[in-house]
Amino acid sequence: MAYTNRRSQPYRPGQSEPFKVSRSKIELFKQCPRCFWLDARLKIKRPSGPPFNINKTIDELYKKEFDKHRAAGTPHPIMTDNGLGAVVPYQHADLNTWRYNFTGVTALHKPTNLHVFGAIDDVWVNEDGELIVVDYKATSKASGVSIDSDWQISYKRQMEVYQWLLRQNGFTVSDTGYFVYTNARIDVEGFGDRLEFTTKLIPYTGNDAWIEPTLADMKATIENNDMPPVGMAAMGGPCDFCEYAKKRTELTLEHLKK
């Protein structure tokens, strides 16, 4: 509880203690510096959407499935089916900590005094001893799954942050990570109390060179008392949240004049 309370305190310019930023806050900054500033400085958060309970359940079931092979030291069928027979789920005493949302893999970025953390889905290891970051994704669409859409840059940045965090902890990490991307089929006759999925293993070659410059920009932003510019929406155009706040404020002020 103490950890959560400290983490929820607003940033104070010039503070000496490290300021915790999650992987999702880095993504928030990349999307909209203003939303990030409001969150970090004033604890004004974006409204949250509904929980993705089915996606979370799929994540947990995948973890159980891969953990069986982790304990046995054997590759999962999705590995062998994709030519990764020498790859196995990685065993480490801190794996459960790395997976836990409120701890994750952590690293202090000393130049900015930002304490970065992020909860991974899974880690594999190849024959060279390199760790492989793995992220589970779930969806339902008629077309096949990919990571090629513009908005999926967030998926790629997510993986790169995890790769960077593990490297900051002294691990040798492969540039190539994998998305275990499962797609609920809609071409079946009915529901029948079950969903059928088709799963695809998608490789991605990460590059974490953007992370440390971004952390420097984040630190400069929260040190500044002025709100930064509005960012971009995932599908293009100004940030949806900032646009809503602007229009609602304008309408409210107009109403108060009456």
Residue ranges and their predicted role:
Residues 1-126, 130, 258:
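Metal-dependent nuclease catalytic cores that hydrolyze phosphodiester bonds in DNA/RNA
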Residues 32, 66, 162, 211, ...:
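A residue-level signal for conserved active-site and pocket-lining positions in enzyme catalytic cores
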Residues 37-38, 45-47, 141-145, 185-189, ...:
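Short catalytic/ligand-binding loop motif for oxyanion handling, primarily in non-cytosolic enzymes
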Residues 98-213:
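Mg2+/Mn2+-dependent nuclease catalytic core
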Residues 56-57, 153, 233:
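Residue-level detector of secondary-structure boundary/capping sites
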Residues 1-5, 11-16, 20-21, 165-258:
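Metal-dependent nuclease catalytic regions and adjoining charged, substrate-binding loops involved
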